[in-house]
Amino acid sequence: MATDRRVSRVSSLIKREVSQMLLHGIKDDRVGAGMVSITDVDVSGDLQHAKIFVSIYGTEQAKAETMEGLKSSVGFVRRELGQRIRLRRTPEVVFLEDTSLERGDRTLHLLNQLQDARKEEDEYIEPAQDD
């Protein structure tokens, strides 16, 4: 088992290298269908598995196409990681869609709606007290 510090360093290296591959290395047109950014990389303690969380901006169709393109390029990404990062074994790579940004945006929107509703309620109650 690798130390937490080592896992963190490998995770950040994978994130940096895969980001570079998204910009310059992956030639699949489906990957360019939506704007892709890597939000997080989760590497297992034995450095054998890497979950790469991606956030995709665009329509639902563009998101689906982009995920298909990323999943089909897993072999290329793993081979490139093996060449760019010096590890005994190159981790198995899995791309997962990260929807946390969308959930956070939706939550903020709901909180803002509640705040606006409370302001309207307070404004409605205050004039009634003046009578």
Swiss-Prot record:
Keyword check for Cytoplasm: yes
One GO MF term: ribosomal small subunit binding
InterPro entries listed in its UniProt record: KH_dom-like_a/b (IPR015946), RbfA (IPR000238), RbfA_dom_sf (IPR023799), Ribosome-bd_factorA_CS (IPR020053)
Transmembrane segments: none
Pfam families: RBFA
UniProt-annotated location(s): Cytoplasm
GO cellular component: cytosol
Principal place of residence: cytoplasm
One example of a Gene Ontology biological process annotation: maturation of SSU-rRNA
Keywords: Cytoplasm, Ribosome biogenesis
Coiled-coil region list: none
PROSITE patterns xref list: RBFA (PS01319)
Keyword match Mitochondrion: no
Quaternary structure (record): Monomer. Binds 30S ribosomal subunits, but not 50S ribosomal subunits or 70S ribosomes.
Family, per entry: Belongs to the RbfA family.
PANTHER family found in the cross-reference section: RIBOSOME-BINDING FACTOR A, CHLOROPLASTIC-RELATED
Described purpose of this protein according to its UniProt entry: One of several proteins that assist in the late maturation steps of the functional core of the 30S ribosomal subunit. Associates with free 30S ribosomal subunits (but not with 30S subunits that are part of 70S ribosomes or polysomes). Required for efficient processing of 16S rRNA. May interact with the 5'-terminal helix region of 16S rRNA.
HAMAP family reported in the protein's UniProt record: RbfA (MF_00003)
Protein name, per record: Ribosome-binding factor A
Organism: Gloeothece citriformis (strain PCC 7424)
